[in-house]
Swiss-Prot record:
GO terms for molecular function: ATP binding; UDP-N-acetylmuramoylalanine-D-glutamate ligase activity. Keywords: ATP-binding, Cell cycle, Cell division, Cell shape, Cell wall biogenesis/degradation, Cytoplasm, Ligase, Nucleotide-binding, Peptidoglycan synthesis. Its main location: cytoplasm. Cell wall formation. Catalyzes the addition of glutamate to the nucleotide precursor UDP-N-acetylmuramoyl-L-alanine (UMA). It catalyses: UDP-N-acetyl-alpha-D-muramoyl-L-alanine + D-glutamate + ATP = UDP-N-acetyl-alpha-D-muramoyl-L-alanyl-D-glutamate + ADP + phosphate + H(+). GO terms for cellular component: cytoplasm. It comes from Streptococcus pyogenes serotype M49 (strain NZ131). Belongs to the MurCDEF family. This is UDP-N-acetylmuramoylalanine--D-glutamate ligase. The keyword Nucleotide-binding applies. One of its GO terms (biological process) is peptidoglycan biosynthetic process. Pathway: Cell wall biogenesis; peptidoglycan biosynthesis. InterPro entries: Mur-like_cat_sf, Mur_ligase_C, Mur_ligase_C_dom_sf, Mur_ligase_cen, MurD.
Length: 452
């Protein structure tokens, strides 16, 4: 990494810990800053805070005392999840204390070029696909960002010959100023996180910050299926490379079941390692990045054909007696499950769905349920999900949890069938998060395989 003097002997407050805050604290300390970390979690429940204290970093836990800002900090590094209307953040802005993001801090010291990926859906899968293809092509791609590897930690190990492949959320992008990736991908834009941003327009503006400092020597990859992309493309200085599953574009596109870049055929959609129309979009974005990075067509095709998905995101788990299991626990809304269902033959599919009841009906899902072999329904939303199944004329059974649902599905399945966990609901009625829910599906698969 670059050793810069910008933060030498500067008093810096890190607001909010988690993985990114811990990494930022260590990086800034290494750069000679005088760091104070403030986290709302009590100290005795905060192993990360305890570890930082042992390293000599000042830590204040249990609350966010506004008076802490009376200490004349010269910078604040804010955790992405803390909104800008937080009293501490508002006070810092009133005092004209510059607020940095952790990803921008990483950018300042990075020797490696950055490929940034954002969007409403498909970020993690596309980020992982891109890194896999670049590495298969002999390059050194390092995953970082919102994918679980804090950018300010990864950047300390990265050298000029590496490439940081960085997943970026709207929370991380909303406050950047200097951040400039060489290649940026926006997978799609849907109205999400409006409780944080306030409006779809503000959410889009946050995502659009990924390209704010890009020039014509940089590349911006946009989803041409969306009308908003054409509008946004007119306002960037970057060179735009579109991708589309609906029309031929001057970039990556789907035509007659084949994925192309420009006029070069790369791979058949049926040969992709993960199913679903959304994964064709993810693969097209990946192809665009790979071609811009000089990866050979045969390597791109081979890598995409062997890509098995990301854990809990339409993850191909394996087979038992020629029955295939997919873990899509990350599908916490109707749209995500619709996209998952698009990749399967409903007549051979058993769907496990249901979860937290948010009061919404599932009428929009009904057309996607038509012809399903069977549903296994669970969770608080079971009654609403049953109504959708009845409208689609799909038979169903009820289960008490994911383990029981998976066992029931396996008993019903026949050779050649697929069992898909794609709940279309959040997990919090039964599980602390979608990862725990998905892990129960994986554990049950392992038990069933052991008994087979």
């Amino acid at each position: 990494m670059k050793v810069i003097s910008n933060f030498q002997n500067k008093k810096i407050l890190i607001l909010g810990l988690a993985k990114s805050g811990e990494a930022a604290a260590k990086l800034l300390t290494k750069l000679g800053a005088l760091v104070t970390v403030n986290d709302s979690k009590p100290f005795d429940q905060n192993p990360a805070a305890q570890a930082l204290l042992e390293e000599g970093i000042k830590v204040i836990c249990g609350s966010h005392p506004v008076e802490l800002l009376d200490e004349d900090f010269e910078y604040m590094v804010k955790n992405p999840g803390i909104p800008y209307d937080n009293p501490m953040v508002k006070r810092a802005l009133a005092k004209e204390i510059p607020i940095l993001t952790e990803v921008e801090l990483a950018y300042f010291v990075s020797e490696a070029p950055i490929i940034g990926i954002t969007g409403s859906n498909g970020k993690t899968t596309t980020t992982t696909m891109i890194a896999d293809v670049l590495n298969a092509g002999g390059q050194s791609a390092l995953l970082s960002g919102n994918i679980g590897y804090p950018a300010s930690k990864v950047v300390q190990k990265a050298i000029a010959g590496d490439t940081l492949v960085m997943e970026l959320s709207s929370f991380q992008l909303v406050g950047v100023n200097a951040f400039r990736p060489h290649i940026a991908v926006i997978t799609n834009l849907m109205p999400t996180h409006l409780d944080y941003h306030g409006s779809f327009e503000d959410y889009v503006a946050a995502k659009w910050m990924i390209q704010a400092q890009m020039t014509e020597s940089d590349y911006l990859i946009l989803n041409a299926n969306q009308e908003i992309s054409a509008t946004l493309a007119k306002t960037t200085k970057a060179t735009v490379i579109p991708f589309s599953t609906q029309k031929v574009v001057d970039g990556a596109y789907l035509k007659d079941g084949i994925l192309y870049f420009k006029e070069q055929a790369i791979i058949a959609a049926t040969d992709l390692g993960v199913p679903g129309s959304h994964n064709i979009e993810n693969a097209l974005a990946t192809i665009a990045v790979a071609k811009l990075s000089g990866i050979a067509d045969d390597i791109i095709a081979q890598c995409l054909s062997h890509f098995g998905g990301v854990k809990h995101r339409l993850q191909r788990v394996g087979q038992i007696k020629d029955i295939t299991f997919y873990n899509d626990s990350k599908s916490t809304n109707i749209l995500a499950t619709q996209k998952a269902l698009s990749g399967f033959d409903n007549s051979r599919l058993i769907l496990i769905a249901g979860g937290l009841d948010r009061g919404n009906e599932f009428d929009d899902l009904v057309p996607d349920l038509l012809g399903l072999k069977q549903m296994i329904i669970l969770g608080e939303s079971a009654e609403r999900m049953k109504r959708a199944a009845n409208k689609a004329e799909v038979s169903y059974l009820e289960a008490r949890n994911v383990a029981e649902a998976t066992e029931l599905a396996f008993k019903l399945a026949q050779t050649g069938d697929t069992i898909l966990l794609s709940p279309a609901n959040a997990s919090w009625d039964m599980y602390p998060n979608f990862e725990v829910r998905g892990d129960e599906f994986l554990a049950t698969f392992d038990c069933l395989r052991g008994d087979a």
